[in-house]
């Protein structure tokens, strides 16, 4: 599949589920059902707004991220995850201490999502990172994903941090009991 197509499919799936069920049905580990997961889609960004963001950071934005912005200039979803609007990306990055050409694009409860456009501009599609609230970029988790694959995986895991899934059977049971 061509880069930038998956984001269209994922967003269409969300909208279909919300339209059909009135919400996005979610099941958390241990069978906990969260029935009122919400999605608040922003209006599309204009081409001028997208160019302004690229100019602001002196970067070429990843194709799939630009596709998302052209469809929805930001999104709040799953009761605690936010993909920032272009205006908020520029605003919130004023206080971030990130390497050149790296910028914050969203939040996951108390963590942050960061694009490393240095990687993208070199042809590497694994450009998305996750930082806990107090982490510095050198402590970031490499999500081994681009924007649309991260978004698809995050939704497939019902908003859980899929990169932190416990693989040890005993520890998995212990985490559910907590």
Regions found by a protein language model. Give the residues of each.
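A glycine-rich, hydrophobic loop/mini-helix early in the fold
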Residues: 64-69
């Amino acid at each position: 599949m061509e880069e930038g197509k998956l984001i269209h499919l994922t967003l269409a799936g969300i909208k279909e589920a919300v339209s059909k069920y009135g919400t996005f049905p979610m099941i958390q580990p241990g069978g906990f059902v969260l029935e009122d997961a919400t999605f608040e889609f922003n209006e599309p960004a204009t081409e001028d707004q997208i160019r302004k963001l690229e100019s602001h950071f002196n970067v070429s934005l990843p194709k799939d991220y630009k596709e998302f912005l052209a469809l929805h200039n930001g999104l709040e979803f799953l009761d605690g995850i936010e993909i920032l609007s272009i205006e908020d990306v520029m605003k919130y990055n004023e206080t971030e201490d990130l390497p050149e050409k790296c910028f914050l694009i969203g939040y996951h409860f108390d963590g942050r999502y960061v694009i490393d456009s240095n990687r993208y501009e070199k042809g590497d599609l694994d450009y998305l990172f996750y930082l806990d609230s107090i982490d510095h970029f050198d402590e970031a988790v490499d999500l081994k994903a681009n924007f649309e694959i991260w978004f698809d995986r995050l939704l497939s895991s019902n908003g859980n941090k899929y990169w932190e899934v416990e693989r040890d059977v005993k520890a998995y049971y212990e985490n559910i009991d907590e």
